[in-house]
Amino acid sequence: MLKLIGSLVLLASAAEVIASPLAESVAPSITLEKRASCTFSGSNGAAAAMASQKACSTIVLSNVAVPAGTTLDLSDLADGTTVIFEGETTWGYKEWSGPLLQISGKNIKVEGASGATLNPDGARWWDGQGGNGGKTKPKFFAAHGLTSSSSITNLHILNTPVQAVSINGCDGLTVTDMTIDDSAGDTQGGHNTDAFDIGSSSNIIISGAKVYNQDDCVAVNSGTGITFTGGLCSGGHGLSIGSVGGRSDNTVENVSFTNSQVTKSDNGLRIKASKGKTGTIKGITYSGITLSSIRKYGILIEQNYDGGDLKGDPTSGIPITDLTMENISGKGAVASSGHNIAIVCGSGACSNWTWKNVEVTGGQTYGSCENVPSVAQC
């Protein structure tokens, strides 16, 4: 009997040894299983999508109605997730600071399906004051921390309460064929409807954007390796660097605006260095830009920005170096009450500029230019 029991024990041990490699070989198939593709819609779609971020490789938001006072927060996505907007995405009304939409992650792909719109219906907040008073208005889209070749493609954004897209803490992000249409704000009190505010980001490409708004088309406040190309900017404040200075990050380097149009805007091209502050503005290029219907300044470069343009004596704490202005077409572009080009630099603070084939006319000559590099015109 004891002999039989011993034999059974030996057989059981052998079975364990034989079985264990098979158990190990099964485990990887579980970890490699693909996550699901998920579609969310209606008034409960936002909450369901937010709760399912790690479970879905593709998140489709189809006619989602986001409740008032809620951020559609997709900042915890699994690496490599695709987010697709279908139909009309809407937001309920509440006075608060937002954002209404937030997306973050590595290698994230955000896409707008054909005919899709993201419509926060900003006219409900517009009162002509923007972020300076009146109703508390939510910012729209916080594209923060998008890295590792993330992309945003074919989004159509309609009527933002104030600022449309904030790009911050991003590296390697490409934005293609985005439309931001706040044109209704021209007559309904839209204000501070910046299209792209960029800070502390690197290696950003914005291509083929169409912007209709009442503030900066692009404002690069800090960052390196930023490109805006093939864009249309209408109704706002033009293509801007800054204001630079007085922030936690005050370096702007290697920024290019190319092959774009600025029309029906207060300014065409603008570089703003804050008076009395420190920082760096280096390697900025404006090339192949067409200006038309500019109300105030065709080109404005100032080192005395102080909450407004051209305020008092310029300072030298934020040098503007290695600036290139080339192939700027603006014949008759500036209103007769405006100024073609205004350059106000601190002593020795504007240097190593390139200025080729720049024609901006129609307005007045600015009579208070200071410390203009010899190659430039003012």
Swiss-Prot record:
Disulfide bonds join C38-C56, C217-C233, C345-C350, C369-C378. Keywords: Cell wall biogenesis/degradation, Disulfide bond, Glycoprotein, Glycosidase, Hydrolase, Repeat, Secreted, Signal, Zymogen. Its EC number is 3.2.1.15. It is found in: Secreted. One of its GO terms (cellular component) is extracellular region. PbH1 repeats lie at residues 147-169, 170-200, 201-222, 247-273, 281-303. Belongs to the glycosyl hydrolase 28 family. This is Probable endopolygalacturonase NFIA_008150. It comes from Neosartorya fischeri (strain ATCC 1020 / DSM 3700 / CBS 544.65 / FGSC A1164 / JCM 1740 / NRRL 181 / WB 181).
